[in-house]
Amino acid sequence: VPYLGSFSCSDPLLTRIWDVGAYTVHLNMQEYVWDGIKRDRLVWIGDIHPETSTIQAVFGYDESVERSLDLARDESPLPKMMCGISAYSLWWIMVQYGWYLQNGNRTFLESQKDYLAELLRYFAGRIQENGAEDLPENRFIDWPTADKPDVIHAGLQGIMRMAFQAGEFLCTELGDGETARLC
């Protein structure tokens, strides 16, 4: 895979950090976008957002991203959450949004329409009357906050908001005004 993007600055350490990050993501780009290439070699959809941003900046379009998004969708028939974590399913929506904005692959987006709409409807049903999220699945954001329920709630609230904004845009693009209005 050719490196299309690059970074350099007056601080050689920052340039080296960028190079190592790009190389690490490159190693993870196999048939799918693997996470933890030395460790568990799984498609952790919750971690794919920074990876897809890096892929787009460094390599441009790569089919491994769409294969990974499809794999996560196909392995998570609703109401099952991706990797068993509701935040990961929310990240899937945001990655769809970013990938579509960057690549404009309408055919790929259309192939996500039914699942996307069903997922957004599920999440819309997990909002309490006071506007707070009420996600029952594994309430996980990241390891440093795993034992902090208030921080997890705030994180899920924010991630849910961003996912609904992304979902509204995608559903509007797909001509699904009914689901867009739920967002």
Predicted regions and their residues:
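Substrate-binding groove/exosite segments of carbohydrate-active enzymes
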Residues: 1-125, 130, 137
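The feature captures the catalytic groove of carbohydrate-active enzymes
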Residues: 75-91, 106, 124-183
